[in-house]
UniProtKB/Swiss-Prot annotation:
Annotated transmembrane regions: 42-62, 73-93, 108-128
Topology of the protein relative to the lipid bilayer: Multi-pass membrane protein
Keyword terms of this UniProt record: Cell membrane, Membrane, Transmembrane, Transmembrane helix
Annotated protein name in UniProt: Uncharacterized protein MG256
Organism of provenance: Mycoplasma genitalium (strain ATCC 33530 / DSM 19775 / NCTC 10195 / G37)
One GO CC annotation: plasma membrane
Predominant place of localization: membrane
Cellular location(s): Cell membrane
Amino acid sequence: MHFNSNFKECFNKIAKKVNSLDSEYYEFSSFIERIRTTFGLLIALTVLSNLIIISFVLIWFFTDGFGQLRLLFFTLFIPFFISLLVAIFLIFLNNSFRNFFQINEKNWLFLWTCVFSSLPIFNLWLIVRLNKTIKNFASDYGFKIVNKYNSLTSGIFVFDFADYVSFEANLTNWKNTNDKNRNFVNFFETISKEKTGVVQKPVLNFQRLYVNRLYYQSKLSVGSNQQTPQTAFDNLRNYVENKQRETVRVKQYILT
């Protein structure tokens, strides 16, 4: 309380000094106008940045495989509530500022421009700050599996959040050891076919398992250490199952 009293006394002295000298008061008012103009220009940035944020989340939400509600909560609602708290804090500060320096009611525009112009800077900073965290949550467990050629061929497309690398290939017939097209293992459809006898499309959320690019490159190519495609497939299946056990508890809660 004592500190708060001294703080108010200090501001009162500054306010009296500003109001006692006309020249300083007008100079200060001009400074306020310049600040208000600057913040007014940032309103356009506010609208643009928040539209970008909302568009990003909507695209993510309505894309097959990334429509999980918890992930939407972490990427949209937490930044929104934090921005709201920042806005309330700025309103309090600017209200005190207006009272101490006796700014007229018409200068409420200055208050609101301060509040709204703070949002784009804060939101953009928050996206940069959370980008690595969101990427880590999504990279190990989130994959979008779609039929690239609309079922006209057996080609498939995989989008990898981890390194933005896509793989294109035809489905491999593991019984045919002469098949040279072994550059992709369709683990998901193979598992569903073994369980039900029917290739399951689309792949369920809990079947989106982790496939590592380096493992793909080193283990799935036919070489001295890979005598048959079945060996490569078994190694991949073991790797995926082990990786899933390590990540499923945390990431299934976040992404499902």
